[in-house]
UniProtKB/Swiss-Prot annotation:
Function: Catalyzes the oxidation of 5,10-methylenetetrahydrofolate to 5,10-methenyltetrahydrofolate and then the hydrolysis of 5,10-methenyltetrahydrofolate to 10-formyltetrahydrofolate.
Family: Belongs to the tetrahydrofolate dehydrogenase/cyclohydrolase family.
Pfam families: THF_DHG_CYH, THF_DHG_CYH_C
Protein name: Bifunctional protein FolD
Residues noted as binding NADP(+) in the record, renumbered to the chain: G166, R167, S168, S191
Pathway, per record: One-carbon metabolism; tetrahydrofolate interconversion
GO cellular component: cytosol
Residues annotated as signal peptide: none
GO molecular-function terms, A-Z: methenyltetrahydrofolate cyclohydrolase activity; methylenetetrahydrofolate dehydrogenase (NADP+) activity
Encoding gene per record: folD
Amino acid sequence: MAEPMILDGNDVSKRIKDKLALQVAALEQKGVRPCLATILVGDDPASATYVRMKGNACKRLGIESKKIELPKETTTKELLAVIRELNNDSSVHGILLQHPVPSQIDERAAFDEIAIEKDVDGVTTLGFAQNAFGFAHYPSCTPAAILAILDHYQLPIEGKHAVVVGRSPILGKPVSQMLLNRNATVTICHSRTENVSDFVEKADIVVAAVGKPNFIQGEWIKSGAVVLDAGYNKGNIGDCEYDGCAQRASAITPVPGGVGPVTISMLLKHTVEAAERSV
């Protein structure tokens, strides 16, 4: 098999941000500065890093980043009050509650408190339902990034058999719905699926979203398949055993530098679009 096409997320991300810079400038002409509010509950180091990365990405593009840090003892009631305040703040266009939250908080209730027009990461129940029906303004950012990569490289989706390994509500489930809405035939595998390899071996498109390092083995990949690795594990390792998968795939995302950069760009894109809709 020839060398696979490397699906460079940094390149896709740059193209998205170049276009967004023009949109931000146009909004500034109207006296509007896009604003993303991020809520971090507790002091989890990984979550703090993710919030900082998102804030830095906002600033580089001229988007205001409003960071709200709450103590880990915060109650559901207190968090809901903070979200309601942001909902009522017309200068805030997007609200992101960093996942996961401490165990005493009802995360679903917190997500669903976010106003649908500010749900730039597609986490509300209503946003999830709109995504399933194919008319969400703001689908979950990582699934949106996966579709953006496929489209950027003009890789066909319609009529292809896509196997999604993972069923999380912020990745596996929504990306399955988005692929289905693009006329792929979709199979979802999960922790209770027996013989996952039997399904992956038949896939034209493999989406790895299982959260286990090197879970997808190279010998599982059908020759010529497209592999999108949405996993990011300790040591900069994805969910796919990269070298083995790359030997059989026609196209593959690296980790890091694949899906991750595009995910952040989709968050920025949704925030700018929310600001445009507010004018």
